[in-house]
Structure formats: C-alpha cells, structure tokens
Swiss-Prot record:
One of its GO terms (cellular component) is chloroplast. It comes from the Eukaryota. It comes from Ranunculus acris. Usually encoded in the trnK tRNA gene intron. Probably assists in splicing its own and other chloroplast group II introns. Belongs to the intron maturase 2 family. MatK subfamily. This is Maturase K. It is found in: Plastid, Chloroplast. One of its GO terms (molecular function) is RNA binding. The keyword Manganese does not apply. Keywords: Chloroplast, mRNA processing, Plastid, RNA-binding, tRNA processing. InterPro entries: Domain_X, Maturase_MatK, Maturase_MatK_N. GO terms for biological process: mRNA processing; RNA splicing; tRNA processing. Its main location: plastid.
Length: 507
C-alpha cells in the first residue's frame, strides 16, 4: 500500500491557478487561430472547418469588451427557448472562446509534461504520432499472441464528473465554471461518442479543439490504471503517456475498490499480472491482446468493467468488451481488417548426404482493405452507388478540367498512401478504378460527351495524373525494388507521416 501511495501521490506544485484572466488576452486567440490553421485535416479546406474569415484583431477586441461588460454570459430574450451568447453573434463568439479555452486549458498539462522529462534524455522522433507506426508493432507482437479484447471506451454518467476530475489539474474556480457553462449551453456531452460526433459533425468541427481536449482527457482518465499495471508487467511500458495520466483519484477510492473485489489489492494485481498483455488505442476503441487463456481474458474483461464503474464512475457494460481469438477473427482497427493467419512455407534441410523437406507454418499479420465499407463511404460521398458502379459528381462540373482531375487524383493518391500496407492490393485497385471512372464521367458530363469518346480523346495522360506521382515517390524511397512493378505491388509499405485518417477512410 505504501508503494501505491507514493505512486499515485500528485505533486501539488504542478497545479496552476488563475487561468481565467488569460481569456481576456488578445494573443491567446491569435495563437489558437494560428494553431488551427497549421493543424487542418489533410484535403479539407478552411471553409469546411469554419476557419475562413473568422479571425481579426477587431473581432477579438470587440469580444473582450463584451466579456468585460457582460455580467452574465447567458441572456434570455422573450423566447425562453432561445439564448443569446454575448450578443447576437453567438456562433462566432462561442467558437472563438471555445478555441481560446482549449488553448489555455492545455497549459497545466504542457507544463507537467516538460517538468516530468527534466533531467532525462528524450529520444527525438518525428514518427511517434504516425498512425502507420502502430502496424509494425502489431506485426512484431500479435503473431505471438492468442486472444484479443475489443473494447469500446466507456463514457461518464454525467459531465460533472469530468469537471471534478479537472479540478485535480486546474484550481481556478472561474475557469471551471466556464467549462460547466459550455457543457450546459450546448448539451453536447452525448456527442463524445463517435456516432453522435458524426451525426453532429458541423457543430463538432466548429468547436473541434475544445471537445477533442475534453474527450482525450476523459480517455486518459479511463486509461490511468494501465500506468500502474505496466509497472507490474514486463511489456506495458509507455513512457510517452506518463505525464497525462491522473493519479490522485485512484488512490482516493482504493478502499471502495477493496470492498468490490473482497480481496487484498496486491493479490488482485497479482491475479491479473500478465507479461504478455499489450494495449493500444485509437479514437473511441481500444485493443488489449494476450497470450493467456480464455479464462484470463474473462478476468480482464470483468476487472475493467468493475474498475471503470466503481472507481471512475464511467458507464460501461460487459457487452462493450468482446473476446476473440486472433486466429479466427478479423480486427477492424484504423481502417484495416487485421488478422493473424499461419503462413505455410517449405524448407529444404540438407544433412550430409540426406535432404529433408520440412513444411512449417509461421504466423503472419494480414492487413486487408475493407472493400465493402469503403465502397459504402464512396457511395455516401456520391462517387459511386452502393454496388460500386461509378457515377459523376455534378457539383464539381463548374470547375476547370485540371482542377477536377487534380481533386480526383488527390483522393486516389490519399487512398493509395494510407492502404499501401495492405497484404492484398486488388481491393485497392478497385477503389482507384471507381475514382478514375467517376472522374471520367464527371468530365464527360461537363463537356456533354460520352465516357468512351472522352477517354479516347484524353488518352494516357488521364491515367498519369493518378499514377505517376505515386510511382515517383515509391521509386525514390525504394530504388532497389522500383524496377519491378510486379514486386512493388506486393510490398507492404508503412508511412510514418500519417497523423490523421481522411473522412472517407474513417470507418
């Protein structure tokens, strides 16, 4: 117990007070705006993300003056169902304040991150944030494991629990009251779930950084137990997450946890200690895999459910955690269908004058392109119908031919870039064919011609726009194998510069 006390004891000097006055500083909004422009999702314009013409020093000064003069942030007009936020410009001002709020609230976390690494050598790498960096890890680890827990991240019963947890990091009462105001004003706590986010995507994009911070903090809370468990395991090392996991509430409710499990805490940890347990997460889903028995995985399942409900007060159910065998289950994660399958091979063994043929099977991680969901995403974006037949994009016919080809080519290269690590490339070729034919139909519709006559007139240059840039990049990265296009098409290539998934790939 003394070890737990030392481990979960929080350094009070790391808390930062008086963050609320920063909302009245002009440079905060300038920093938030500049950061937003540099962190846009690839292939999405500023108009889509609502950043166009939304910032100027005059608007910021006007906002700050209103904040000084306003006694109450919410003003009710004659219609009690409608609210005015800081005057008439509700959407603009609320978005600016939420962006500034998100930039300020990260200060305590950033200071703690810097202080936690003082005096330590930190390995510099630009690839730590890449989505593709997860798959080489899976290739090395998953082939030796048996079972996987497919977990949906739980969410709190009420957003007030999140505000209470933030009090461990932020002591400014005014700042916390402002957080409550935002959550009550928008009634948007349910949008923390992935499905609700997609349904209310426009509102979420306008307040993207604010809600992403709250959601990420909520996830860090639910994962804080793994920071302690990794000390008891050989393979749960995660240095990069050490500064973001809260430690106070876990020790504060340890007695309640004892009553639930009716056992000594050290004994409970020993029961679930597993040197072959691996954990990783992206968005609202997390994966835990182990080499243990099905009984051990069931223990992990109910341990997590009880821990989240009794310690963190997160709503969760056993049916949100699925136990599957890696050998006969496809894992839908990060836009890929991944599975572990035996890869048979024949080895010729020569001993003196005798030769032996040995059949062996080595487990290999297969990463496949989910063709059906991707076609559904393309159909939703009006590139094809649900059966995969290409259709034209009437909304793009007003653009120049070069712009239309460039937009289709950019989407096509984006797919090729992300799914370059697929074990089988045929589904990817089908997606590229749908996009190329959709581009041809769009151009033919614009020029009031048939697809066949238009392709005949355009010639091979049409295909080069889709293929030549990708081939040049690969030949530069892999000059030794670029001479053989057949061999290159079979190679799995992981890129370490992908930090986001395009909307069409976000399945």
């Amino acid at each position: 117990m003394e070890e737990l006390q030392r481990y979960f004891k929080m350094d009070r000097s790391q808390k930062r007070d008086f963050l609320y006055p920063l909302l009245f500083q002009e440079y905060i909004y300038a920093l938030a705006h500049d950061f937003g422009l540099t962190k846009l999702i690839p292939y999405e314009s500023m108009q889509i993300l609502s950043y166009e013409n939304k910032y100027s020093s005059l608007i910021v000064k006007r906002l700050i003056i209103r904040m000084y003069q306003q006694k109450h942030l919410i003003i009710f007009d004659n219609d009690s169902k409608k609210k005015k936020f800081l005057g008439h410009n509700k959407n603009l001002y609320s978005q600016m304040i939420s962006e500034g709020f998100a930039x300020i609230v990260k200060i305590p976390f950033a200071l703690r991150l810097v202080s936690s690494y003082q005096g330590k050598e930190i390995e510099k790498s630009i690839n730590l944030g890449s989505i593709h960096s997860t798959f080489p890890f899976l290739e090395d680890k998953f082939v030796h494991l048996n079972h996987v827990l497919d977990v949906l991240i739980p969410y709190p019963i009420h957003f007030e629990l999140l505000v209470q947890n933030l009090r461990c990091w932020i002591q400014d009462a005014s700042f916390l009251h402002l957080l409550r105001f935002f959550l009550y004003e928008y009634h948007n706590w349910n949008s923390f779930t992935t499905q609700k986010m997609k349904q209310n995507s426009l509102f979420f994009k306008e307040n993207r950084r604010f809600f992403l911070f709250l959601y990420n903090f909520h996830v860090y809370e639910s994962e804080s137990i793994f920071l302690f468990l990794r000390k008891k395991s050989y393979h749960l090392r995660s240095i990069s997450s050490i500064a973001f996991l809260d430690r106070t509430h876990f020790f504060g409710k340890i007695e309640h946890l004892k009553v639930v499990f009716r056992n000594d805490f050290h004994t409970m940890l020993w029961l679930f200690k597993d040197p072959f347990m691996h954990y990783f997460r992206y968005q609202g889903k997390s994966i835990m895999s182990s080499k243990g028995t099905p009984l051990l995985m069931k223990k992990w399942k109910y341990y997590l459910v009880n821990l989240w409900e009794c310690h963190f007060y997160f709503w969760s159910q056993p049916n949100r955690i699925h136990i599957n065998q890696l050998s006969n289950h496809f894992l839908n994660f990060l836009g890929y269908l991944s599975s572990v399958r035996p890869n048979p091979s024949v080895v010729r063994n020569q001993m003196l004058e005798n030769a032996f043929i040995i059949d062996i099977a080595i487990n290999k991680l297969n990463t496949l392109v989910p063709i059906i969901p991707l076609i559904g995403s393309l159909a939703k974006a009006k590139f094809c119908n649900l059966s995969g037949q290409s259709i034209s994009k009437p909304a793009w016919t007003d653009s120049l031919d070069s712009d239309i080809i460039e937009r289709f080519g950019r989407i096509c290269r984006n797919f090729s870039h992300y799914y370059s690590g697929s074990s089988k490339k045929k589904p990817l070729y089908r997606i590229k064919y749908i996009l190329r034919l959709s581009c041809a139909r769009t151009l033919a519709r614009k020029h009031k011609s048939t697809v066949r006559s238009f392709l005949k007139r355009l010639g091979s240059e049409f295909l080069e726009e889709f293929l030549i840039e990708e081939e040049l990049v690969l030949s530069f990265i892999l000059p030794k194998i670029s001479s053989s296009s057949h061999r290159l098409s079979k190679e799995r290539i992981w890129y370490f510069d992908i930090i986001r998934i395009n909307d069409l790939m976000n399945l």
